[in-house]
Amino acid sequence: MGVKAAQTGIWASQGQSIRVVGFQAQTAHRAICLLGFVVLVLLQCCSAYKLVCYYTSWSQYREGDGSCFPDAIDRFLCTHIIYSFANISNDHIDTWEWNDVTLYGMLNTLKNRNPNLKTLLSVGGWNFGSQRFSNIASNTQSRRTFIKSVPPFLRTHGFDGLDLAWLYPGQRDKQHFTTLIKEMRAEFIKEAQPGKKQLLLSAAVSAGKVTIDSSYDIAKISQHLDFISIMTYDFHGAWRGTTGHHSPLFRGQEDASPDRFSNTDYAVGYMLRLEAPASKLVMGIPTFGRSFTLASSETGVGAPISGPGIPGRFTKEAGTLAYYEICDFLRGATVHRILGQQVPYATKGNQWVGYDDQESVKSKVQYLKERQLAGAMVWALDLDDFQGSFCGQDLRFPLTNAIKDALAAT
């Protein structure tokens, strides 16, 4: 009976005493948990910087440990999470994957315990193509139909805004892209008038000078966007015929035109010169690397290649490795740092991969702070070590966490 009293706290005076103590302990525990939750929320919401993180729906199809669903995401890791991608069907925003609605729910459930988290839905992407966007944006009725379809779709599925991923507007689309953004913003303002919180509007833009010049009126689109994610990666690929880092912070000593434009520093500076407000510019940091197959015994930057690198075990795309695949590659590899560009690369056999690590992302965050930018963008959460089982640190999302910590550092 004494044991039962101790367990239930309702029979004997001794049991009642135990019940009170248990209640006090539970109350204290809950208070500590609540305090920890409040601290995490305050740390996130009160940071001066955005950490905008993309999640790709097709990552669910990767085999085994490479498969990633939205419920694997740390709800306190990013300030904004962008779901990629939505489709456009008959001039209306629409789902792309067969289970998008389920995944939308998984993602937006993260906000239940972090009300400061913002989620956006990105429309477009590489597979969508530029021509379909062009057809919609250039036709007044199609554009209007698309714009009107967006707010109810976002509200229905619990998103806080829209991200435009038109890759890329052509020269003739430049004005149409500006008009699309301006009219979308006007619709968001109008839709919010009944007392709803206004939907956010962002865009992902190229970091290449030629594309920037032909595709965007930066000064005008900046007026109507909450933030602009500049994709400061993929500066270098197998099409160059030589090795090179795809996301260098600075120009390399050996770089000549057009390579002198192919770095983060130039792209950011150029955007600022084109009147993109620093307070709206979010700088891209990749959680993937670009790999090459060497054509000779040369292994340095600028070495000849025979083509892209061997596909990764999970991503299965020649020339691309997720950070967690790179961690596997580094076992037995030789690591080098390109000091002037402040990024690493690694070689093993005839394989060469340029990537970002925790040291290089910290350098990039320090740079964006010095430029007084709005924050960092990550492509993509599912390419980081999201399980914490590949990179030997017992830490989930090591690159994204390094970015977050660097943003929070004083």
UniProtKB/Swiss-Prot annotation:
Glycans are attached at residue 87. The keyword Hydrolase does not apply. Disulfide bonds join 53-78, 327-391. GO terms for molecular function: carbohydrate binding; chitin binding. GO terms for cellular component: cytoplasm; endoplasmic reticulum; extracellular space; perinuclear region of cytoplasm. Residues 351-365 are annotated as: Important for AKT1 activation and IL8 production. Residues 1-48 form the signal peptide. Residues 49-410 form the GH18 domain. The keyword Plastid does not apply. InterPro entries: Chitinase_II/V-like_cat (IPR011583), Chitinase_insertion_sf (IPR029070), Glyco_hydro18_cat (IPR001223), Glycoside_hydrolase_SF (IPR017853), Glycosyl_Hydrlase_18 (IPR050314). GO terms for biological process: activation of NF-kappaB-inducing kinase activity; apoptotic process; carbohydrate metabolic process; cellular response to tumor necrosis factor; chitin catabolic process; inflammatory response; lung development; positive regulation of angiogenesis. Chitin binds at residues 97-98, 124-127, 168, 231-234, 290, 379. Its main location: secreted. Keywords: Antimicrobial, Apoptosis, Cytoplasm, Disulfide bond, Endoplasmic reticulum, Glycoprotein, Inflammatory response, Lectin, Secreted, Signal. It is found in: Secreted, Extracellular space; Cytoplasm; Cytoplasm, Perinuclear region; Endoplasmic reticulum. Belongs to the glycosyl hydrolase 18 family. Monomer. Carbohydrate-binding lectin with a preference for chitin. Has no chitinase activity. May play a role in tissue remodeling and in the capacity of cells to respond to and cope with changes in their environment. Plays a role in T-helper cell type 2 (Th2) inflammatory response and IL-13-induced inflammation, regulating allergen sensitization, inflammatory cell apoptosis, dendritic cell accumulation and M2 macrophage differentiation. Facilitates invasion of pathogenic enteric bacteria into colonic mucosa and lymphoid organs. This is Chitinase-3-like protein 1.
